[in-house]
UniProtKB/Swiss-Prot annotation:
GO terms for molecular function: isopentenyl-diphosphate delta-isomerase activity; metal ion binding. The lineage of its organism: Eukaryota, Fungi, Dikarya, Ascomycota, Pezizomycotina. Its cofactor is Mg(2+). A motif (Nudix box) lies at residues 129-162. It comes from Aspergillus fumigatus (strain ATCC MYA-4609 / CBS 101355 / FGSC A1100 / Af293) (Neosartorya fumigata). Pathway: Isoprenoid biosynthesis; dimethylallyl diphosphate biosynthesis; dimethylallyl diphosphate from isopentenyl diphosphate: step 1/1. This is Isopentenyl-diphosphate delta-isomerase idi1. The gene is idi1. GO terms for biological process: dimethylallyl diphosphate biosynthetic process; isopentenyl diphosphate biosynthetic process; sterol biosynthetic process. InterPro entries: IsopentenylPP_isomerase_typ1, NUDIX_hydrolase-like_dom_sf, NUDIX_hydrolase_dom.
Length: 279
């Protein structure tokens, strides 16, 4: 006798149903960061008991909730967007990954702080975070979305690494593409830049080449390191080092190819992709 497993596919998330499926989503979208004193804030959450106070506060930041086509349809707290229970039901939000290279074409890596709620102590690219559901960082069309992501990247490079805006001006950021990933963390928290049935990504990949001064925020970053492509490949072979899943995905699928053309006109052919890469 043959048994058939039943697979439940999450409904397609749209502007019309997102508030019904996820009551924590605010469909007004453009709003200020939730203050930590509001009812239902992350500091009052049982799921976050025992975590670092500052990292818990940051879970009240407002992420941009998207439909399958990377169009903003609402906003929700970082906590709501990173709960695997919501991710598994298809809650989608926008993210970015910055790859900063110095004048010697070395990539700046960071090791995430032990205090981080998701992926603590793992090595990753220079900066990875989320544009917020606030004026200036939210965009519906691709050009506006890219500008919003660049502004968010500039903000987070300062907040995490102490890199001042004048050293990373918006016009120096280069947008390459968007990718999909779903990266479980510890079963409760994760990253999901798609819905499971269509695999539409919203992780915006940015390059910037600049020599910068670092003033690392120890609550965000445990360590930093500049590496060549060969040195990074050697790091990947060391069993004692752990890397964020999206970083290894980007490296193995596209980064090393792009990196080989850094500083040449040949790199231009990879920039500004309109299509979303489904990984």
């Amino acid at each position: 006798m043959t048994s058939t497993a039943t697979v439940t596919v999450p409904p397609r998330i749209t502007a019309e149903n997102v508030a019904t499926l996820f009551p924590e989503v605010d469909t007004s979208l453009a709003r200020e960061v939730f203050p930590s004193t509001v009812e239902g804030s992350a500091k009052d959450s049982e799921e976050l008991a025992g975590y670092d106070e500052e990292q818990v506060r940051l879970m009240d930041e407002v992420c941009i909730v998207l439909d399958d086509d990377d169009k903003p349809i609402g906003s929700a707290s970082k906590k709501a967007c990173h709960l695997m229970t919501n991710i598994d039901r298809g809650l989608l939000h926008r993210a970015f990954s910055v790859f900063l290279f110095d004048s010697n074409n070395r990539l700046l890596l960071q090791q995430r702080a032990s205090e981080k709620i998701t992926f603590p102590d793992m090595w990753t690219n220079t900066c990875c975070s989320h544009p917020l559901g606030i004026p200036g960082e939210t965009g519906a069309e691709l050009d506006a979305a890219v500008l919003g992501v660049k502004r968010a990247a500039q903000r987070k490079l300062d907040q995490e690494l102490g890199i001042k805006a004048e050293q990373v001006p918006l016009e120096k950021f280069e947008f390459f593409t968007r990718i999909h990933y779903k990266a479980p963390s510890d079963g409760k928290w994760g990253e999901h830049e798609t819905v499971t049935d269509t695999q539409i990504l919203v992780d915006y990949i940015l390059f910037i080449q600049a020599d910068v001064d670092l003033n690392v925020n120890p609550n965000e970053v445990r360590d930093t390191k500049y590496v060549s492509a060969q040195e990074l490949k050697q790091m990947f072979t060391q069993p004692g080092l752990k890397f964020t899943p999206w970083f290894k995905l980007i490296c193995n699928s596209m980064l090393f190819e792009w990196w080989s053309y850094l500083g040449t006109a040949d790199l231009d052919k990879y920039k500004g992709e309109k299509e979303i890469r489904r990984m």
